[in-house]
Swiss-Prot record:
Keywords associated with the record: Coiled coil, Cytoplasm, DNA-binding, Isopeptide bond, Metal-binding, Nucleus, Phosphoprotein, Transcription, Transcription regulation, Ubl conjugation, Zinc
Major location category of this protein: nucleus
Entry GO MF terms: identical protein binding; metal ion binding; sequence-specific double-stranded DNA binding
GO cellular component: cytosol; nucleoplasm
Residues recorded with modification Phosphoserine: 373
Descriptive protein name: Glucocorticoid modulatory element-binding protein 2
Cross-link (Glycyl lysine isopeptide (Lys-Gly) (interchain with G-Cter in SUMO1)): 155
Length: 530
């Protein structure tokens, strides 16, 4: 069913000023109400006045007029006198469901949806709030929900008879034409300006044999996307489908959209975002109702970020728990270490004083001068009885001088030291062995092993007057043949650091062997050298 165009022609507005006198004589504000009618049809009759009511000084006097056979519109003009100047305010009575209000045209500026321009019960609200208060919030297009004399506000504005106040000067660039151009003109999606209305030719507008005005329902904001269209719009698209042109139109749409989106995708890679790209995105979202897709992407990203934040929080809590466990473990180990240290301190014995070190043996240098000096520094000699067992030699301290003298010399009570040049006084390992001043080793030496710790290794030294016997602790008898009077500085310490005692031996000349017992004449203090 085709809907005919609405042609409205505004006639001359007549303003009549009549003074009003109060009954009680008090001065009140003069309110003048002038009824201005417009003829909506070429064959209009006289206007019939239904009713007229007077409101207070803040609101204009409203009067509703109806015509039975012809469409008429009542316009209320409120004239308020401020001093000597007169100010006219034009209001339009509007309805939404069962609710009634007045549209203040001077405040009805672009885009209008959220502008407070509707006077409802002495309150000025926005058209969107008026639709919600009327219980028509399910209608997403507020221009369809609001009517003037039973005609949708959208149809009146599409016809051009009503527009926003000073729209040519004040425009938000969010308003768009609701007409479709079927004569070949193209409108770019990136154009920020509104499209102009181009009238349809009869050939282009002829759908199913009847001329009609084709309108495309659009939205003022993303929330005004509508799923309902008029019968004429549906008939137009069905005619394109029947003519086999709908596929071609869709392909053109797809190609245009692909090129536009491809260029947009290339441009958004380089920051910052350009203004024209932002306008293009806004138009795409508004025209195609893709605000829900944007919200879906944001909600998905927010959900992902929330999951990541929760995972990071759990990982951080686990790491903090591990750190606390390591700190507690370290504290326990430190406490145990301190306890063990205290126990060890109580169990540690008092250190005993280190034993006195045994004096080192003084090594005399070889040569007659050294031996003479060693002999002359003798002091504190200790006389021993003749025939002392060899086992008692182990108790002789270090640094002593042991001399073997004949019994005739011992009887005199004073030992005679051999001259330094005599071969009978060799220096052996820190011990000086002194012999009598007689012949070289005149007496043979006989060792009696009277203890189990003394071992006689050889008795061949009895035949050689130049053999030297050494007593080493544990007591062992060693023979060193062939040394004779040239023996010097022969000393050897045992692994245990025992005392080394050396004694010269000699054998008597003659066919018979003569033996003699070692007689230790004296032990003299030796000068300690370090």
């Amino acid at each position: 069913m085709a809907t005919p165009d609405v042609s409205v022609h505004m006639e001359e507005v007549v303003v009549v000023t009549t003074p009003d006198t109060a009954v009680d004589g008090s001065g009140v504000e003069e309110v003048k109400t002038v009824l201005v009618t417009t003829n909506l049809a070429p064959h209009g009759g006289d206007l019939t006045e239904d009713n007229m009511e007077t409101e207070n000084a803040a609101a204009a006097a409203a009067a509703a007029f109806t015509a039975s056979s012809q469409l008429k519109e009542a316009v209320l003009v409120k004239m308020a006198e401020e001093g000597e100047n007169l100010e006219a305010e034009i209001v339009y009575p509007i309805t939404c469901g069962d609710s009634r209000a007045n549209l203040i045209w001077r405040k009805f500026v672009c885009p209008g949806i959220n502008v407070k321009c509707v006077q409802y019960d002495e309150h000025v609200i926005s058209p969107k709030e008026f639709v919600h208060l009327a219980g028509k919030s399910t209608l997403k297009d507020w221009k369809r929900a609001i009517r003037m004399n039973g005609i949708m506000l959208r149809k009146i504005m599409d016809s051009g008879e009503l527009d926003f106040y000073q729209h040519d000067k004040v425009c938000s660039n969010t308003c768009r034409s609701t007409k479709i151009d079927l004569s070949g003109a193209r409108v770019s999606l990136s154009s920020p300006t509104s499209t102009e209305y181009i009238p349809l030719t009869p050939a282009a507008a002829d759908v199913n044999g009847s001329p009609a005005t084709i309108t495309i329902e659009t939205c003022e904001d993303p929330g005004d996307w509508t799923t309902t269209i008029g019968d004429d719009t549906f008939a137009f698209w069905r005619g394109l489908k029947d003519a086999g042109l709908l596929d071609e139109v869709i392909q053109e749409f797809q190609q245009e959209l692909e090129e536009t989106m491809k260029g947009l995708q290339q441009r958004v890679q380089d920051p910052p975002l350009q203004l024209r790209d932002a306008v293009l995105l806004n138009n795409i979202v508004q025209n195609f109702g893709m605000l829900d897709l944007v919200k879906k992407v944001l909600a998905s990203h927010k959900c992902q970020m929330d999951r990541s934040r929760e995972q990071y929080a759990r990982d951080l809590a686990a790491l903090e728990q591990q750190c606390d466990e390591h700190r507690r473990r370290a504290k326990e180990l430190k406490h145990k270490s301190q306890h063990l240290s205290n126990v060890l301190m109580t169990l540690t014995p008092v250190p005993l004083p280190s034993p006195m070190k045994r004096p080192r043996l003084a090594r005399a240098t070889s040569g007659p001068a050294a031996m003479a000096s060693q002999v002359l520094t003798q002091s504190a000699q200790i006389a021993l009885s003749p025939g002392m067992p060899v086992s008692q030699l182990t108790s002789v301290p270090l640094g002593k001088v042991v001399s073997t003298l004949p019994s005739t010399v011992l009887g005199k009570g004073s030992p005679q030291a051999a001259p330094a040049s005599s071969p009978a006084s060799p220096l052996l390992g820190g011990y000086t062995v002194l012999a009598s001043s007689g012949s070289t080793f005149p007496n043979a030496v006989e060792i009696h092993p009277d203890t189990s710790s003394l071992t006689v290794l050889s008795t061949a030294a009895m035949q050689d007057g130049s053999t030297v016997l050494k007593v080493v602790s544990p007591l062992q008898l060693l023979t060193l043949p062939g040394l004779g009077p040239t023996l010097q500085n022969v000393a050897q310490a045992s692994p245990a650091g025992s005392t080394i005692v050396t004694m010269p031996t000699a054998t008597a000349t003659g066919p018979e062997e003569h033996t003699a017992t070692i007689e230790v004449a004296a032990v003299a203090e030796d000068h300690e050298q370090k």
